[in-house]
Amino acid sequence: MGTCATACPTEAIHYALPNPEDTQKFIERTLANYEQAGGLDPIVLICSSRHEIYNVMALKALPDNVIPIVVEELPSVGIDTWFAALVNGATQVLFAASRFMPQTIIRVLNSEVGIAQELLDQLGIAKETIDILYLESLREGAPTLCTESFDLALGDLQGNKRQRLFTALDALSASRIPVENIVELPANAPYGTVSCENKDCTLCMSCVAVCPTRALHTDGQSPSLKFVEQDCIQCGLCEKACPEKVLTLTPRMNWVKEERQKAVVIHEEKAAECIRCHKPFAPQSMIDMLQNKLRGHSHFSDEAAINRIAMCEDCRVIDMFESMAADPMSQLKY
């Protein structure tokens, strides 16, 4: 039904036909043609092709500046497309829904629209600018219609789902002053930051290994953990993978584009140097942790074995063979 495509923050799952970019281009060109024809204050009404009769009834009750965009399923159009419409001339985006739709669709639609409305509110824009229009409510009266123009026409937005969304959000925030630069979002929002309790982090890189978007990454040159906020989808995999439990997720929106896109170091250490060749090879905290945990183990009963942990991969092998050559009988102890 398309709900998974709307809920997916990375576009790993997306509607294939039409794909999101084609839908956005269609809406952008429809709005451009409407403006060229002299139309004012266009409102986009996203309708499902499964409910044609109800769509016609809704349009009869709405003013002429409401433009229907028919899709196979309402949830097949994601939050990036909604905001793309706003930065291409639309004054409002509505969904022609019914309370008799499957609860799965209603739940996902409410969740995603709720996040969009929170973002709008942070920019001082009326929450109703993106809203669900339940057709049954038309019997009670006309819905709240927004006619304030944002005076934007960005055209086709480039990149993946998140890049297109943030392009639209940055354009809106450039014309509006956000309430605050950093504002908390609901717990289900796929935008936010990750913080690290540095004193307990060993830089094992388990979080980097599981991060699906490379929001958490390392440069491979030094023992450091880097983070790009715009790429974080708040999936929680890093939090679950961390053996020391030092990572904390915070859903929020950082409206400062440069800060959000910048790779920041959330933890770094001086590299431990091999005690034989002095080559940097691992975080010092990890070496200390391994030595403390393995001290007393039967395979690390002597100081020589403990010291090998503080050696690089090459020197460790050399030291083992030197020890075996000096005292071959010691191997019989194991």
Task: Outline where the language-model segments fall.
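Non-heme iron-sulfur electron-transfer modules
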Residues: M1-T6, T10-Y34, V179-V183, R214-K240, ...
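Cofactor-cradling patches in redox/metallo enzymes
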Residues: T81-D131
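Long, compositionally biased charged/polar accessory segments in the mid-to-C-terminal portions
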Residues: N65-V66, E72, N88-T91, A97, ...
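Short hydrophobic beta-strand segments
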Residues: G39-S48, Q92-S98
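Short, compositionally biased pre-sequence/patch detector
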Residues: V77-G78
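Ferredoxin-type iron-sulfur electron-transfer modules and their immediate structural context
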Residues: D41-I53, I105-I106, E118-D219, D231, ...
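Short acidic, S/G/P-rich loop/turn micro-motifs used as interaction or catalytic elements
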Residues: S49-A58, E73-L74, R99-R107
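Short helix-loop-beta junction
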Residues: A58-I67
